[in-house]
Structure formats: structure tokens, C-alpha cells
Curated annotation (Swiss-Prot):
Residues 1-82 are cytoplasmic. The gene is Nsg1. Widely expressed in brain and spinal cord. Expressed in neurons during maturation and synapse formation. One of its GO terms (biological process) is clathrin coat assembly. Belongs to the NSG family. It holds the Pfam family Calcyon. Plays a role in the recycling mechanism in neurons of multiple receptors, including AMPAR, APP and L1CAM and acts at the level of early endosomes to promote sorting of receptors toward a recycling pathway. Regulates sorting and recycling of GRIA2 through interaction with GRIP1 and then contributes to the regulation of synaptic transmission and plasticity by affecting the recycling and targeting of AMPA receptors to the synapse. Is required for faithful sorting of L1CAM to axons by facilitating trafficking from somatodendritic early endosome or the recycling endosome. Keywords: Cell projection, Cytoplasmic vesicle, Endoplasmic reticulum, Endosome, Golgi apparatus, Lysosome, Membrane, Signal-anchor, Transmembrane, Transmembrane helix. This is Neuronal vesicle trafficking-associated protein 1.
């Protein structure tokens, strides 16, 4: 804490330190604003372009002007359009990042539950693992394997024979016999 009552005016006189718990630090007097301001100049000289023009008329040597070639794709475009294009590019970039993250999650971070094994980016039961290892990984082989399984399944289906088939076949035979008899007669 600071003991009040000290000032810069008392700078030369040192008082003995009192052991009352206060430090005797001289307080600063308020700063006068008039001390900070400089008086305004009597005359202000502002040089304009017209003061430099007579130099050229007098024939003083100046470096030749070099034609500037600038291409501006934003010339004549409103600020609103510029901001819209910037936002569009930012959204496209963020969309690409999101798709990349989603792809990585589905492609590489696949964990199968207990009792399943990851084969060809699919979780299959451990009991069927030997069935899937017999198949080749190429697309043509997979296609032919599917067709062969379809043919085997089709052959294993028992065909139910209609009781009317024998009657219809006998009827067709009798019709053919009557037609043959009519043609011969």
C-alpha cells in the first residue's frame, strides 16, 4: 500500500522509513495537457501536382514513361460478386475435405464385430471365410462364380411334375395320330 501525502516537490528531503506497514512512494501530480501540445505552425505548405508540372514544361530531363500493361480480371466486377465467388470456392474446398474424410472413414477404418472377418471391404462371418477365399478377387472371376452358383442352385431345385402333363402328352399324341390318319385318308 502507498502512504498518501507525498509529492514530487518533496523530492530532495528524505524522510526516515516508518515501520507502520506503508511504503512512502511519492505520488505523481496530474499531467497538464498544455505541456503536450505544440503550438501550431504559422504557415503550412502543401505541394500539389500542379507545382511539379512546370518542371516538365521547362525541359528538364525526366526518365521516359514506360507503358504499363496490367490485366485485371476483377475490373468492372462488384464487390458482392467477388465475395460470392470467394465463398463458393471456400464451400467447394470444404466439401472436398468432408468427402475425403468420409471416404477415409468408410474405406480404411472399418472394424468388424466379434465373430466376423473383413474380406474385400465387407464383414463376413468367420464360418464363411473359407468360402470367400476360394473365390478370386478379379471381377470376371466373381461374375462367373456367381453364374455357376446360380446354375447349381437351379439344378438342385426339384421340379414338380404336374399330374396333368401325362394327360396332355397323351392328348397331343392322339391328336397327332388323328391328323396323320386324316391326311392319309
Amino acid at each position: 500500500m502507498v502512504k498518501l501525502g507525498n509529492n514530487f516537490a518533496e523530492k530532495g528531503t528524505k524522510q526516515p522509513l516508518l515501520e507502520d506497514g506503508f511504503d512512502t512512494i511519492p505520488l505523481m501530480t496530474p499531467l497538464d495537457v498544455n505541456q503536450l501540445q505544440f503550438p501550431p505552425p504559422d504557415k503550412v505548405v502543401v505541394k500539389t501536382k500542379t507545382e511539379y508540372e512546370p518542371d516538365r514544361k521547362k525541359g528538364k530531363a525526366r526518365p521516359p514513361k514506360i507503358a504499363e500493361f496490367t490485366v485485371s480480371i476483377t475490373e468492372g466486377v462488384t464487390e458482392r460478386f467477388k465475395v460470392s465467388v470467394l465463398v463458393l470456392f471456400a464451400l467447394a474446398f470444404l466439401t472436398c475435405v468432408v468427402f475425403l474424410v468420409v471416404y477415409k472413414v468408410y474405406k480404411y477404418d472399418r472394424a468388424c464385430p466379434d465373430g466376423f472377418v473383413l474380406k474385400n471391404t465387407q464383414c463376413i462371418p468367420e464360418g464363411l471365410e473359407s468360402y470367400y477365399t476360394e473365390q478370386d478377387s478379379s471381377a470376371r472371376e466373381k461374375f462367373y462364380t456367381v453364374i455357376n452358383h446360380y446354375n447349381l442352385a437351379k439344378q438342385s431345385i426339384t421340379r414338380s411334375v404336374s399330374p396333368w402333363m401325362s394327360v396332355l402328352s397323351e392328348e397331343k399324341l392322339s391328336e397327332q395320330e388323328t391328323e396323320a390318319a386324316e391326311k392319309s385318308a
